[in-house]
């Protein structure tokens, strides 16, 4: 029931770290699951219990709603140590279970998190590497809404309608309404924010989400 007020810096990474530091590991290790979620997504479009029931049935250490698929053609941010963008759970929603919360690897990760100065740091020091790092340590992960690697790298933004209709993804990116026309044409197959709006506010979907 605590609300933490902080200076708006360090992006979502520092918000998560601030909350972790204030609660402390002694309290956090008692949690069954810890959710790290930011405000770059909107929803829910569908009842969240669908997603939680589905993921609760899986033997995992951490999970997310969506993932960014591997991009091997370099590092556009210049901050990712492996030189490319690994497949990763997107940081707008990551749930971490007790098996991982109480691990020294997870605790050391946050205790030693470096300063986040800009968006490139947020991606390179956390989002792009988090899944790869902990997966290689043996922690099991998955995502709820997965369009498949062959579809595109960023389906929650570039295939929003398909994610909602075919995968019942409960969230969509706020940035869907702030895309330039160049991006709409080249990345989202001509899908417009208006089309997404009609899906989001359509009567069957709206009633299902609030029921």
What residue ranges belong to the model's regions?
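ER/Golgi luminal nucleotide-sugar-dependent glycosyltransferases, focusing on the catalytic module
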Residues: 1-198, 202
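Single conserved hydrophobic/aromatic residue that forms the stacking wall/gate
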Residues: 199-211
């Amino acid at each position: 029931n605590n609300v933490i007020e902080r200076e708006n810096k360090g992006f979502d990474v520092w918000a998560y770290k601030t909350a972790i530091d204030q609660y402390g590991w002694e309290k956090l290790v008692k949690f069954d699951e810890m959710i790290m979620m930011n405000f770059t997504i909107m929803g829910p479009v569908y009842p969240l219990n669908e997603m939680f029931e589905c993921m609760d049935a899986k033997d995992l250490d951490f999970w997310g709603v969506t993932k960014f698929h591997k991009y091997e053609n370099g590092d556009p941010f210049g901050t990712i140590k492996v030189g490319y963008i690994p497949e990763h759970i997107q940081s707008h929603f990551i749930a971490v279970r007790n098996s991982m919360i109480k691990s020294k690897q997870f605790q050391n990760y946050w205790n030693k998190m470096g300063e986040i100065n800009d968006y490139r740091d947020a991606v390179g020091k956390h989002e792009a590497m988090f899944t790869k790092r902990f997966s290689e340590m043996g922690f099991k992960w998955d995502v709820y809404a997965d369009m498949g690697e062959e579809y595109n790298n960023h389906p929650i933004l570039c295939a929003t309608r398909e994610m909602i209709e075919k995968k019942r993804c409960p969230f969509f990116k706020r940035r869907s309404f702030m895309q330039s026309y160049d991006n709409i044409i080249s990345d989202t197959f001509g899908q417009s924010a208006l089309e997404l709006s009609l899906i989001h506010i359509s009567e069957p979907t709206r009633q299902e989400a609030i029921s």
